């Protein structure tokens, strides 16, 4: 399992990952195991007390590690955020927006959703901190929504490594309506192509009739 504990704030986390994806985490407030997919909990089990004990051990060791480092604070890295839909966007069809925040260190961050500049809390879910190979972290925040051409969305990221909150904007890309001039040009091109096809077809028919007439054997006198 992955244990994270830091101060100030007494912030801790215990998670298990498989192939880069979160398998389960221990809810520290409810003191229970939360599976990412309910089916996992039917196949196996994990005693949340094991996770709580690991966090307590991390808390105990943190003081010694801090002294060994001569109380040198960790370097705050600036996280990077990207927003994208889970599925191709169709107006009026339920979908999910994903805010992927990478290069998080230390693992303390606030991720919030805004719709038309107003905070949104319904339909929001986020993962625990997931570990990268360079020992930084990443996290995903999800927002279920129904796309509308009247709504715009922002993923707001706040972190110690940022001078100010970062907003990652997203809105549905709706094709611009075709102008009357464009429609006229398209119709004219279609008509021209059709006329050319008729003329070429007529020429081929005439040539075919002529070649057929010259090759016909003469009849009896």
From Swiss-Prot:
What is the organism of origin for this protein? Mus musculus
Protein family per UniProt: Belongs to the MHC class II family.
GO terms, biological process = adaptive immune response; antigen processing and presentation; antigen processing and presentation of exogenous peptide antigen via MHC class II; antigen processing and presentation of peptide antigen; positive regulation of T cell differentiation
Give me the ranges of the annotated region Alpha-2. Answer: 77-170
In terms of PROSITE patterns, this protein maps to:
IG_LIKE (PS50835), IG_MHC (PS00290)
Q: Which UniProt keywords apply?
A: Adaptive immunity, Disulfide bond, Glycoprotein, Immunity, Membrane, MHC II, Transmembrane, Transmembrane helix
Residue ranges that the UniProt entry lists as topological domain Cytoplasmic: 210-221
Which residues face the membrane's Extracellular side?
1-183
Q: Which residues form the Ig-like C1-type domain?
A: 79-171
Q: Can you list the disulfide-bonded cysteine pairs?
A: 99-155
Segments passing through the bilayer: 184-209
Q: What is its main location?
A: membrane
Molecular function per GO:
peptide antigen binding
Could you tell me which CDD domains the record lists for this protein? IgC1_MHC_II_alpha_I-A
* Region Connecting peptide: start-end pairs: 171-183
Subcellular location per UniProt equals: Membrane
Designated name of the protein? H-2 class II histocompatibility antigen, A-Q alpha chain
Do the record's keywords include Transmembrane helix? yes
Q: Which InterPro entries does the record match to this protein?
A: Ig-like_dom, Ig-like_dom_sf, Ig-like_fold, Ig/MHC_CS, Ig_C1-set, MHC/Immunoglobulin, MHC_I/II-like_Ag-recog, MHC_II_a/b_N
């Amino acid at each position: 399992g992955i244990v994270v504990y830091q101060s100030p704030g007494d912030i801790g986390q215990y998670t298990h990952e498989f192939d880069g994806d979160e398998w389960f985490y221990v809810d520290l407030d409810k003191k229970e195991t939360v599976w990412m997919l309910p089916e996992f909990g039917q196949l196996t089990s994990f005693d949340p007390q094991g996770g709580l004990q690991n966090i307590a051990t991390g808390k105990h060791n943190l003081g010694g590690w801090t002294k060994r480092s001569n109380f040198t604070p960790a370097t705050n890295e600036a996280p990077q955020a990207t927003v994208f839909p889970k599925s191709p966007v169709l107006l009026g069809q339920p979908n999910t927006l994903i805010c992927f925040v990478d290069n998080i260190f230390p693992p303390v961050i606030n991720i919030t959703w805004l719709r038309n500049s107003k905070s949104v809390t319904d339909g929001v879910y986020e993962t625990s901190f997931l570990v990268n190979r360079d020992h930084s972290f990443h996290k995903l925040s999800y927002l279920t929504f129904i796309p509308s051409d009247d709504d715009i969305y922002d993923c707001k990221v706040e972190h110690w490594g940022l001078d100010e909150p970062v907003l990652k904007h997203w809105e549905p890309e709706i094709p611009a309506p075709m102008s009357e001039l464009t429609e006229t040009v398209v119709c004219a091109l279609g008509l021209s192509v059709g006329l050319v096809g008729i003329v070429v077809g007529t020429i081929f028919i005439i040539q075919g009739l002529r070649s057929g007439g010259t090759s016909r054997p003469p009849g009896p006198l």
